[in-house]
Regions:
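N-terminal flexible/basic segments that precede or flank functional cores
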Residues: 1-13, 65, 74-78
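Residues at secondary-structure transition points
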Residues: 10-14, 28, 50-57, 78
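Short basic helix-loop element that most often maps to the first helix and adjoining turn
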Residues: 17-32
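Conserved hydrophobic/aromatic packing and binding residues within compact polymer-binding modules
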Residues: 19, 33-34, 44-47
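Recognition helix of helix-turn-helix/homeodomain-like DNA-binding domains
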Residues: 38-53
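DNA major-groove recognition helix of helix-turn-helix/homeodomain DNA-binding modules
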Residues: 55-73
């Protein structure tokens, strides 16, 4: 699903906040999340700031490590 740039930018900020809050709830430092997920610290930092363009593979690694569910919703239902 491709979202308009403005909407996707907002979603990235929300996504980053979710990652940061869940990491905090698990009391993990960015370095620890990096080691457990195989995602570079720089990438985690960018995602948490709502920046960058993370690959789906990266998102899935983080969600799996943080025990978050990844749900895909059809654009028609938005």
């Amino acid at each position: 699903v491709f979202l308009p740039t403005e909407r996707w930018t907002m979603d990235l900020k929300i996504f980053g906040k979710i990652i940061r809050e869940k990491r905090g709830a698990l009391r993990l430092k960015q370095e620890e999340l990096s080691e457990k997920s195989g995602v570079a610290i720089k990438t985690i930092h960018s995602i948490e700031l709502g920046k960058g363009n993370p690959a789906i593979k990266t998102i899935l690694r983080l969600f799996e490590t943080l025990e978050l569910d990844f749900i895909v919703v059809s654009a028609k239902s938005l």
